[in-house]
């Protein structure tokens, strides 16, 4: 079984099984330089012993120049416990600021 998580789930706690896939889908527009990153400006899991991450960007169906698409993070929980997945929408060369958009979902793995 897998779980689909969107921006509407910000701050939510999901109960998942160890080894289960959670797909986080967030609006993104890399043509502006912005994308979703973990703390430290990385696309990789900040804690590989707790969960692994694969990341992919899907462009929009629109032909409009500069239209945003969707960034997908496939998160697989590797250990029991509650794990926070924290993402920040930012430009990697400037880092997060006080007004950066943030997304957090808590994965409670049994």
Swiss-Prot record:
Domain notes: The BC, DE and FG loops form a tripartite wedge that blocks the substrate-binding site of target cysteine proteases. The BC loop interacts with the catalytically active cysteine and histidine residues of the protease catalytic center.
Span of the annotated motif FG loop: 91-100
Function recorded in the entry: Cysteine protease inhibitor. Inhibits cysteine protease cruzipain.
Gene Ontology MF annotations: cysteine-type endopeptidase inhibitor activity
Main localization category: other
Quaternary context: Interacts with cruzipain.
Motif (DE loop): 59-68
Gene3D superfamilies in the cross-refs: 2.60.40.2020
Domain of life (superkingdom): Eukaryota
Family: Belongs to the protease inhibitor I42 family.
SUPFAM superfamilies (UniProt xref): ICP-like
InterPro entries referenced in this protein's UniProt entry, alphabetically: Chagasin-like_sf, Cys_protease_inhibitor_I42, Prot_inh_I42_chagasin
GO CC, one annotated term: cell surface
Protein name per the record: Chagasin
Sequence motif: BC loop, positions: 29-34
Pfam families: Inhibitor_I42
Source organism per UniProt: Trypanosoma cruzi
Keywords from the UniProt entry: Cytoplasmic vesicle, Protease inhibitor, Thiol protease inhibitor
Cysteine disulfide partners in this protein: none
Oxidoreductase in keyword set: no
Protein's cellular compartments: Flagellar pocket; Cytoplasmic vesicle; Cell surface
